[in-house]
């Protein structure tokens, strides 16, 4: 569960930024809701490859940022890798997923999920 992941080059990556509601902080309850959702995805959908949950650490790189940016607010990111965008979308229409994701959305004011194709990857 906390080990390294391997991502095939052909995979698509979905990047979901989940902004927490005003006054909501990272908590065991939120972490449990995210874990429940991740477990549903991992154990149910064959075209799911891997995923990561990232808690915003509160800093913005001045060296790596260009242009205007403001406070990012309290949020977390869900990064998932799938065999296809179509498989991802089908999974997210299923009642089982919608119920689990609803548990996460109880803590969120908004969520936006963007899809990406891998153009380069490497490791050291």
Write out the residue ranges for each language-model feature.
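Short S/T/G/P-rich N-terminal loop/turn motif that feeds into the first structured element of a domain
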Residues: 1-98, 107-124
């Amino acid at each position: 569960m906390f080990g390294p992941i391997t991502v095939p080059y052909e995979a698509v990556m979905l990047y979901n930024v989940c902004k927490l509601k005003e006054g909501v902080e990272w908590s065991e309850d939120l972490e449990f809701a995210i874990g429940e959702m991740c477990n549903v995805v991992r154990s149910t959908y064959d075209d799911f490859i891997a995923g990561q949950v990232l808690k915003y650490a509160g800093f913005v790189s001045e060296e790596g940022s260009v242009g205007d940016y403001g406070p990012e607010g309290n949020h977390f990111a869900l990064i998932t890798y799938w065999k296809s965008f179509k498989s991802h979308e089908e999974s997210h229409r299923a009642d089982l997923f919608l119920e689990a994701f609803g548990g996460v959305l109880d803590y969120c004011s908004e969520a936006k999920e963007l899809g990406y194709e891998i153009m380069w990857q490497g490791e050291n």
